[in-house]
Amino acid sequence: EVEQILRNKQVFVCSLAFLGEGEHSEAFLVNRDIVVKLPKHRQASECLKTEMQVVKGLGTKLNVEIPNVLFQGAFFHEGEEYTYFGSRKLPGHSLNKKQFCALPKPILDKNAEIVANFLYRLHSEKNVLPIQREGDVLVHGDFSLNHLLFDQNQMVCSVLDFGDSHVGDFQEDFLYLLDEEDEEEFGADFGREVLANYKSISSCSLQGEF
């Protein structure tokens, strides 16, 4: 099915590997350098449309890599139209909670700064999605450890999966960061450090406006 869909985009498939799936979509690695996301249901197709709008709007404005849109298209399944898109494979590797929490404190401290900067920059973007209520911001919507990639120095270098992005309260992106009990997430100590950095950046920014 993936090869047939890509044939319409004149993408010649030399290699194809299943990367994984989430609630909304399945991801495939094509030719070792292109990630294609296919929706699993009708609502997921709408999420992919939002994701494309968000990553196109953000472009290179953030301090880490995010998906781009190399190509996009639609296919029909049982009479319904579904949207998909392809992006370049992002650099980095994933870490589970045990691996992440075992990082040296200076590395964790630096990662807390990187994450705080990413979230602040994301939340500061006013023109990617319509913001109608004062205080609302653009949120990632599913900011969890499994959506981060790390470079060879174990620093956050890429953020994945903007399919749940929407306009809402900035605290939504701290849900997993501040979770005390989730065995798959960052750990609340790290989350509190991120939040402290975030508030510091926000405070400096506000002071600069006066």
Kindly give the residue locations of the regions a language model identified:
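Juxta-kinase regulatory segment immediately upstream of eukaryotic protein kinase catalytic domains
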Residues: 1-13
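ATP-binding pocket architecture of kinase catalytic cores
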Residues: 15-131
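Active-site acidic catalytic loop and adjacent metal/ATP-binding pocket
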Residues: 17, 26-30, 36, 128-174
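Conserved strand-to-helix beginnings and helix N-cap segments that scaffold or border functional pockets
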Residues: 48-49, 80, 153, 171, ...
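Active-site loop signature of alpha/beta-hydrolase-fold enzymes
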Residues: 92, 165, 177
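Active-site activation/catalytic loop segments of kinase-like enzymes and analogous catalytic loops
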Residues: 172-203
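All-alpha amphipathic helical-bundle segments outside canonical DNA-binding/catalytic cores
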Residues: 203-210
